């Protein structure tokens, strides 16, 4: 996923989370906000792992998102917050979980 699609700044994360629009599952939480372009940020709480492991999981998630084709057509900013259960899954299960959540997100935003 290209860098232009990443959310990096803390105030951007906070603005999206404070909008309180969300899709929740057992392993992930998606907060979203309408925007004219697609952007995504991944957040893993500090108490789950050290910095090296958190960055590893973020890279895994970005690799999964890179494989999903129709993401850039979405006109939303999304903050993905990872829960502890998600980190125990293997790569293919993580990919299925993210795809399932994105489908739920697409269905939710149509309502």
From Swiss-Prot:
EC number, UniProt record: 3.1.26.5
Oligomer and partners: Consists of a catalytic RNA component (M1 or rnpB) and a protein subunit.
UniProt cross-references to InterPro entries, sorted A to Z: Ribosomal_Su5_D2-typ_SF (IPR020568), Ribsml_uS5_D2-typ_fold_subgr (IPR014721), RNase_P (IPR000100)
Protein name, entry field: Ribonuclease P protein component
PANTHER family tied to this protein: RIBONUCLEASE P PROTEIN COMPONENT
Organism of origin: Mycoplasmopsis pulmonis (strain UAB CTIP)
Record keywords, A-Z: Endonuclease, Hydrolase, Nuclease, RNA-binding, tRNA processing
Any single GO BP term: tRNA 5'-leader removal
Database matches in HAMAP family: RNase_P
């Amino acid at each position: 996923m290209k860098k232009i699609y990443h959310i990096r700044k803390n105030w951007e994360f906070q603005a999206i989370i404070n909008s309180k629009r969300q899709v929740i599952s057992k392993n992930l939480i998606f907060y979203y906000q309408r925007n004219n372009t697609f952007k995504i940020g991944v957040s893993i709480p500090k108490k789950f792992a050290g910095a090296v492991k958190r960055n590893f999981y973020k890279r895994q998630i970005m690799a999964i998102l890179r494989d999903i084709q129709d993401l850039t057509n979405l006109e939303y900013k999304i903050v993905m917050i990872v829960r502890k259960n998600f980190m125990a899954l293997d790569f293919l299960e993580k990919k299925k979980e993210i795809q399932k959540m994105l489908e739920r997100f697409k269905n939710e935003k149509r309502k």
